């Protein structure tokens, strides 16, 4: 970073601009401790550069002002002086001013306005008073660089429509004058689009109902287009195509008011006059596209159905289906008319190409009919493709393929793939290797000759053609290959192609993959080709073969393809026996229940369960066989009043389940348990006798069992 003293000295005698601009940028340490006098000194030195008579110094000062405009303090203190000096420089520009200097000055003025716009106080004090002068100077210098100044005026129309209102008609007349000039056809497409888009934004300066002005302008353009299409009726028999007549009647006519477009003059004896017709159609279609694509600050209703009718009407005028009139007999005149029709079709395709990106799913109802019209644009020779015409009109075919891809991409699956057969064949035809016509004709003449050589020297170049014919092939341009790749990429992911066409597509993909193998050494594969290869693997169609090995050899580090090459399944779960888990759970439950049962057993032994036990009425000793029967669970369930047998049964169960039970210190219950289990009942009648004994209505009472007694 340069210190402030060095910057001031450099502004006095400028030599290199980059270090100065980098040191003055926003956030630089220079601004952290700059004083007020130093700031005034910096601004005055910069303004002195802009007042120099040397153009380089003025250009140097303009670029420094552009950097200083990011500083709020400088613009708040000296903004009015800076803007005034810039407007003086713009006023001094003339036809001898260099384009670099002029563009730098205009960009600096726009940057200063952008830095002020949005700040209420600065906008009120600096920008609003100077806006009329800025717009007026832009219109005054309009002839210096029309396309550039129109692009710079568009933001002022959107941001300041009220201030721009007095200049709206003047700008509109200048734009229309440029559009209707003969030189407009030589402008690049980007410049043409700028003029058309800016003209559509002028509707925002209307004081009342700008949306109505927008709609009326659009319908007037559509009516003018309909009138222009009827001129082709002077050369072609529209009466032979009833559908075309219906289409033209559905398109609204222009109003009876005076049109902004002058009438066309076409002389049948002057072939060059025919090209004014497609030029007028191109202007109208570009203007319609500008009205549809340019952003507006108001809500506008778009007649999408009429727009679709306009495109359909232009594409339906085709000399393949509509014959020429008898008056048109000259073959050269017919060929010129065919060429003008193709130019008109190209303009309509330009409008059709942008519609999917604007209206999306609203175009789906018109998609099938549009694709049918696009298929008719492919040159045919009887029932087969005219490959020579397809190759000769390579750019037009690429535009058709782009429109097809844009419309098919609106849906996730397109069912009617039979209508795409011609389009696929045409796409494959323009990417095939070609040989020049001169070499092919020379080769044919050589083969048809009788072997007589007039001169030995004449056969030298022909020998190269015969032995190394591949060196004379014309390579397909990269742009054409990209168009076809994009078209194929959309088709294989949205439609199931017929077997023959799918094989052609796969062959094309494999050839492109092999051609791209040299990119492996460079480490990069084009993104579009990468997507095409991946989609070709993901959508194999009805074929049993796969190009996965070839694609994997090229895209080795692709994560998606690595899943197909080395499938990674989820980790295998270990099988666990449920029985073991249940046994462990039972053991845990038993271990938790053992202390409780031990406490219950201790209470039973010590006679502490007085609350749960039912005291018997008598203390008679029960016979031995009766005591054994009480331990059976079935007998216990019969008498709900007796709870003592249930307690003894649970105690027995808890003790018998343990292999080596740990006896409590004062627990002496195991002895009566062993005595009760000593005799075994093997007869089934024992259980029956037990039930009969319990069901007997005798006066037998349950004696109290004294577990504390010592049998020994």
From Swiss-Prot:
Component of the RIX1 complex, composed of IPI1, RIX1/IPI2 and IPI3 in a 1:2:2 stoichiometry. The complex interacts (via RIX1) with MDN1 (via its hexameric AAA ATPase ring) and the pre-60S ribosome particles. It is found in: Nucleus. The lineage of its organism: Eukaryota, Fungi, Dikarya, Ascomycota, Saccharomycotina. This is Pre-rRNA-processing protein RIX1. Belongs to the RIX1/PELP1 family. It comes from Meyerozyma guilliermondii (strain ATCC 6260 / CBS 566 / DSM 6381 / JCM 1539 / NBRC 10279 / NRRL Y-324). Pfam families: RIX1. The gene is RIX1. It comes from the Eukaryota. Residues 643-659 have a biased composition (Polar residues). Residues 609-625 have a biased composition (Basic and acidic residues). GO terms for biological process: rRNA processing. InterPro entries: ARM-type_fold, RIX1_N. Residues 435-450 have a biased composition (Low complexity).
């Amino acid at each position: 970073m340069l210190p402030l003293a060095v910057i001031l000295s450099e502004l006095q005698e400028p030599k290199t601009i980059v270090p100065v601009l980098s040191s003055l940028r926003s956030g630089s340490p220079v601004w952290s401790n700059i004083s007020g006098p130093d700031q005034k000194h910096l601004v005055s030195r910069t303004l002195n550069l802009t007042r120099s008579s040397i153009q380089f110094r003025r250009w140097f000062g303009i670029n420094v002002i552009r950097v200083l405009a990011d500083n709020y303090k400088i613009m708040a203190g000296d903004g009015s002086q800076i803007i005034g000096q810039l407007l003086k420089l713009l006023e001094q520009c003339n036809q001898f001013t260099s384009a670099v200097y002029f563009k730098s000055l205009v960009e600096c003025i726009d940057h200063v306005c952008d830095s002020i716009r949005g700040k209420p106080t600065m906008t009120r004090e600096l920008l609003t008073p100077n806006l009329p002068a800025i717009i007026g100077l832009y219109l005054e210098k309009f002839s210096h660089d029309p396309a550039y100044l129109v692009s710079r005026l568009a933001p002022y129309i959107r941001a300041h429509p009220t201030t721009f209102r007095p200049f709206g008609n003047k700008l509109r007349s200048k734009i229309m004058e440029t559009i209707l000039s003969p030189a407009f056809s030589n402008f690049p497409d980007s410049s043409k689009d700028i003029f058309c888009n800016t003209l559509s934004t002028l509707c925002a300066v209307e004081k009342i109902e700008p949306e109505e002005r927008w709609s009326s302008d659009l319908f007037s353009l559509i009516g003018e287009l309909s009138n222009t299409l009827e001129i082709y009726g002077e050369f072609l028999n529209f009466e032979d195509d009833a559908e075309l007549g219906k289409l033209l009647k559905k398109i609204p006519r222009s109003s009876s008011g005076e049109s902004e477009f002058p009438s066309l003059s076409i002389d049948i004896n002057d072939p060059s006059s025919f090209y004014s017709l497609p030029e007028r159609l191109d202007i109208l279609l570009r203007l319609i596209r500008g009205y549809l694509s340019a952003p507006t600050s108001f809500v506008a209703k778009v007649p999408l159905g009429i727009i679709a009718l306009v495109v359909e009407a232009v594409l339906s005028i085709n000399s393949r289906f509509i014959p020429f009139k008898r008056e048109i007999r000259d073959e050269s005149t017919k060929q010129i008319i065919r060429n003008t029709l193709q130019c008109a079709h190209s303009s309509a395709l330009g409008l059709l190409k942008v519609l999917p990106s604007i209206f999306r799913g609203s175009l789906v109802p018109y998609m099938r009919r549009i694709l049918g019209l696009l298929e008719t644009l492919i040159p045919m020779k009887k029932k087969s493709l005219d490959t020579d015409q397809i190759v000769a009109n390579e750019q037009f075919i690429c535009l058709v393929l782009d429109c097809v891809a844009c419309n098919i991409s609106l849906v996730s699956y397109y069912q009617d793939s039979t209508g795409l057969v011609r389009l696929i064949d045409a796409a494959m035809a323009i990417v095939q290797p070609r040989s020049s016509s001169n070499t092919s004709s020379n080769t044919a003449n050589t083969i048809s000759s009788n072997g007589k050589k007039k001169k030995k020297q004449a056969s030298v170049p022909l020998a190269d053609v015969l032995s190394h014919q591949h060196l004379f092939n014309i390579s397909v341009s990269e742009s054409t290959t990209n168009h076809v790749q994009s078209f194929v990429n959309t088709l294989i992911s949205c439609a199931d192609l017929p077997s023959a066409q799918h094989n052609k597509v796969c062959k094309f993909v494999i050839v492109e993959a092999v051609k791209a193998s040299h990119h492996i050494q460079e480490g990069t594969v084009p993104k579009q080709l990468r997507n095409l290869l991946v989609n070709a693997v993901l959508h194999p169609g009805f074929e049993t073969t796969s190009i996965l090995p070839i694609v994997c050899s090229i895209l080795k580090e692709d994560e998606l393809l690595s899943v197909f090459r080395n499938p990674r399944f989820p980790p295998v779960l270990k099988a666990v026996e449920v029985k073991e888990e249940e046994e462990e759970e039972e053991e845990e439950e038993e271990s938790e229940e053992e202390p409780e049962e031990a406490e219950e057993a201790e209470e039973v032994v010590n006679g502490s369960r007085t609350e749960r036990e039912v005291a018997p009425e008598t203390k008679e000793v029960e016979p031995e066989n009766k005591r054994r029967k009480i331990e059976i669970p079935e007998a216990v369930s019969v008498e709900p009043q007796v709870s003592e047998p249930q307690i003894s049964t649970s105690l027995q169960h808890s003790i018998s389940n343990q292999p080596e039970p740990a006896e409590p210190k004062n627990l002496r219950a195991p002895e009566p348990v062993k005595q009760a289990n000593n005799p075994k009942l093997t007869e089934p009648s024992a259980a029956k006798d037990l039930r009969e004994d319990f069901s007997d209505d005798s006066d037998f009472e349950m004696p109290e069992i004294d577990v504390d007694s010592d049998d020994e």
